Amino acid sequence: MKAKVIIKLKDTILDPQGLTIHHALETLGYKNIESLRSGKFFEIELNVEDREKAVEIVDEICKKLLANPVTEEYQFTIE
């Protein structure tokens, strides 16, 4: 099974990287972009057959290592 994980800063946290990219895009002429937030994306190959077990493992990985629960939120899909 494959997990696809997206981690982003919480909406209440300032995103300086996203702001920098947004300003750069405006400089390049992309004036129609309202806002931009950056984040991280991970693909994780799992050697499990049970979908519920895969969800449990990926959720645990996100909580323990990939995401900072104070500043970030995450979501994932299992394929």
Q: PLM features: what roles do these ranges have?
A:
Residues K2-K4, K8-F41, V58-E79:
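Long, contiguous binding/interaction regions
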Residues F42-N47:
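Amphipathic alpha-helical segments that form the core helices of the histone-fold
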